[in-house]
Amino acid sequence: LNPTYGTVTLGQPLEAASILNRLQAIAKVPLLNTADFEAGVGFRIAGATQFPRLMAFGAARDERLAEEAGRITGEEARALGVHVNFAPVVDVNNNPRNPVINTRSYGEDPEMVGRLASAYIRGLESAGVAATLKHFPGHGDTDVDSHLGLPIIKHPRSRLDQMELVPFRAGIAAGADAVMTAH
């Protein structure tokens, strides 16, 4: 395990908690454990709660459900020893040619994305897990998968302020602890 970066494949919940506890015990400084639990802990760990992708929450337009998903994800993450969740996705799904965001987004309305993300953040952080907004400055209106190429938003700053940045501002106001840049 590199002192500044490590990755562990987490299997079942008990196995994951055991691995993270052992790593924490042997670390010379306390570890800050992070994970990508976009759709619940079950998104990465078999046997934990897995939620539908965020678009389902957007279709329901129910902040209470988004907050509850955040709370459950946070409680399960903390039980494993995870401190930071790389979620929620706050990209606005406004380009049908986008090959990677689509169902990972709450939807095409930036205000609604901001409201649902804020509710999720409240739930996640009520369980003691830090939230990470992603993918700054927005990956919704691109047509390239950032895992395979460099996505570019070809709009002026004024358009970013009206669309892509709206959910980021809402998430920051709700208390998000981190922002992940597009990659």
Regions found by a protein language model. Give the residues of each.
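N-terminal beta-rich core of secreted/periplasmic extracellular enzymes
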Residues: L1-H135, L165, R169, A173
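Binuclear metal-dependent hydrolase catalytic cores centered on His/Asp/Glu-rich metal-binding motifs
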Residues: V144-Q162
